[in-house]
A protein has these predicted regions:
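Peripheral, non-AAA+ core regions of ATP-driven protein-machinery
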Residues: 1-218, 222-228, 330, 470-471, ...
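Walker A/P-loop
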Residues: 219-259, 324
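Walker B catalytic acidic pair
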Residues: 299, 305-307, 317
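P-loop NTPase nucleotide-binding/switch module
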Residues: 170-209, 213, 240-294
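Basic, amphipathic alpha-helical bundle interface domains used for macromolecular binding and assembly
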Residues: 39-44, 59, 66-76, 288-289, ...
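Short beta-strand elements
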Residues: 18-24, 282, 386-389
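The Walker A (P-loop) glycine that initiates the GxxxxGKT/S ATP-binding motif of P-loop NTPases
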Residues: 221, 284, 306
Length: 511
């Protein structure tokens, strides 16, 4: 008897429906074809044990299973459940009524219980798109899949529940979530607040500009100056995520199995990988491709603490994603693109000792050591960071103040107003949402300068020997400063402030 059941495979952040054809005929043997990997090939052992431990058995006949399309490699143990259901249906142990309306996924334990799978959200989206009515998967993934409306999500804890469901002995209660209502109910501010930061008013101003225009920023200062504290509070002043952004973000995190039992991600991601991470961990890839940190930070913040401590090769692979807002992983058999529209926040000490330019500490690093230290960060990478700012230690008088600083809520209101201005400006440009994303044509249209501003910028370019990319960065930051001031035109004062935020371009940085 030939039976078809349906599962799904995830490539990148998109799913592809897999047809599992099970044929049982005279003879003996278990044959699984259709380009399965080792984990899928081993499924027969898990299925046999799970069936035996739940009062069922493999039929004593020849079982041939084809997983189509055959040119796509099937990876992982998430096909255990659909394979088991297909075998039971083909052997007549469970009813096959309406089974073609189901997508089924789940990894079996030997006792028949189910382990969570990766990519439940993209699978649910694809199932809805292709007209499937029901999606059976492990209970731990049910909230995640139920984000998708108009498909019945059936979360189960073990194989027996699925068998009883098809045999009409018991019904599985669907998991239902009103996605929009849940989203708007759970939008909340992150746990960190800028009011906790004593002093550092000029740095807070930089962070506000960065948040308003989506600009990348690097903080340079000695240990204990507050760089990490400031960076962790940046998400608290970014505009709340839209529902579409929340779905995009959740989809990426679903692929790596990071949203089990949680459902929709409501707050902007903040990712802070250790400086020992590899280039694959940062940008994604591997033998079985997975999103890297830059994609997990999509629609949020990627914080690279102690930037020069990262391997130079690791930092260099990030250059293109910073420009393109996506990363493409190419291999002989496939090409996968992951979104990576994130704000980069980096921090670093000004020298190996950490105290260069600190008048209260002795300089213990030689010019050669400092040059070697800073050379780990290439010029092209620095050019892609819009704002460079020096962070100095907070004096005792400021630390001992009881008065709290401005709250994140207050700063966020100004940032959101600036973003509204940008949304209106770029309404006819679907790929551009804020100033940091402007291309050359948009710069020429929206960043026109007066004669005074042009002269000021020309002098800065010549004196600091700035690159063409740095020129573009200054214009973008100036445009954001003008938006925060609710001014239509870019003034000389806006250009002047933006030039100040190119610390690492200044002559004499190394003394």
């Amino acid at each position: 008897m030939l039976i078809k059941v349906y599962g799904s495979a995830v490539f990148g952040i998109e799913a592809t429906t897999i047809t599992i054809e099970v044929n049982i005929d005279k003879g003996i043997g278990y044959h699984l074809v259709g380009l399965p990997d080792k984990a899928v090939s081993e499924s027969s052992y898990r299925i046999s044990a799970a069936l035996s431990n739940n009062g069922f058995k493999l039929p004593g006949k020849k079982i041939i299973i084809n997983m189509a399309p055959a040119d796509i490699r099937k990876e992982g143990a998430a096909y255990d459940l659909p394979l088991a259901i297909g075998i039971l249906t083909a052997s007549g142990q469970i009813k096959s009524k309406n089974i073609e309306q189901y997508i089924i996924m789940g990894e079996l334990s030997l006792d028949g219980s189910l382990q969570p799978v990766k990519g439940a959200l993209p699978i649910a989206l694809k199932a809805k798109e292709e007209g499937f009515k029901h999606f059976i998967l492990p209970e731990k993934n049910a909230k995640e899949a139920a984000i998708v409306n108009d498909i019945e999500v059936l979360g189960v804890n073990n194989m027996t529940e699925v068998i009883n469901h098809f045999n009409e002995k018991e019904q599985i209660t669907p998991t239902v979530i009103d996605t929009q209502a849940e989203f708007y109910k759970n939008i909340d501010f992150p746990e960190f607040d800028f009011s906790d930061v004593k002093g550092q008013e000029s740095i807070k101003r930089c962070m506000e500009i960065a948040a308003a225009g989506g600009h990348n920023i690097i903080l340079i200062g000695p240990p204990g100056a507050g760089k990490t504290m400031l960076a962790k509070r940046l998400p608290s002043i970014l505009p709340p995520m839209t529902l579409q952004e929340a779905l995009e973000t959740t989809k990426i995190h679903s692929v790596v199995g990071k949203v089990q039992n949680t459902g929709l991600i409501y707050q902007r991601p903040f990712r802070s990988p250790h400086h020992s991470c590899s280039d694959v961990a940062l940008v994604g890839g591997g033998q079985y491709p997975q999103p890297g940190e830059i994609s997990l930070a999509h629609n949020g913040v990627l914080f690279l603490d102690e930037l020069p401590e990262f391997k130079r090769s690791v930092l260099e692979v990030m250059r293109q994603p910073l420009e393109d807002r996506e990363v493409t992983i190419s291999r002989a058999r496939f090409t996968i693109t992951y979104p990576s529209s994130f704000m980069l926040v980096a921090s670093m000490n000004p020298s190996p000792s950490g105290y260069f330019n600190d008048t209260n500490a002795p300089i213990t690093s030689s010019p050669t050591e400092m040059l070697r230290y800073l050379s780990k960060i290439s010029g092209p990478l620095l050019d892609r960071i819009d704002i460079h700012i020096e962070v100095t230690p907070v004096p005792f008088e400021k630390l001992s103040e009881e008065r709290k600083g401005e709250t994140s809520v207050s700063i966020r209101k100004r940032v959101t107003k600036a973003r509204v201005i940008q949304s209106e400006r770029f309404k006819d440009f679907p790929m551009t949402h804020y100033n940091a994303q402007m291309n050359v044509k948009q710069l020429n249209e929206f960043c026109k300068l007066s004669t005074e501003s042009k002269l000021l910028l020309k002098n800065a370019m010549e004196k600091l020997n700035l690159s063409a990319r740095a020129y573009d960065r200054i214009l973008k930051v100036s445009r954001t400063i003008a938006d925060l001031a609710n001014e239509k035109d870019i003034c000389a004062s806006h250009i002047s402030e933006a030039i100040q935020y190119r610390s690492l371009d200044r002559e004499g940085w190394l003394g």
